[in-house]
């Protein structure tokens, strides 16, 4: 099975909200890493099935984050 990995850097305060969004989207869980030298930021990585391409998944996530008024620093994806 092929997976797409998407990493998003956000403020630590919104991690719980992001977890709820990921559960609604189709996430198989997520990994949270605190950004070195910046304890207020966290990198959240999720793994999604590749039945959609990277750009489709990024658009879905970006829309969900905007709808929830969650801003992010960056979003990176890879297969």
Predicted regions and their residues:
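N-terminal auxiliary segments of SAM/dcSAM-dependent transferases
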Residues: 2-79
């Amino acid at each position: 099975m092929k997976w797409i990995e998407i990493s998003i850097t956000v403020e630590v305060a919104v991690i719980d909200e992001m977890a709820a969004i990921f559960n609604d989207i189709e996430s198989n869980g997520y990994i949270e890493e605190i950004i070195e030298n910046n304890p207020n930021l966290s990198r959240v990585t999720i793994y999604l099935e590749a039945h959609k391409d990277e750009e489709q998944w990024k658009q879905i996530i970006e829309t969900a984050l905007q709808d929830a008024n969650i801003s992010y620093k960056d979003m990176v994806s890879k297969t």
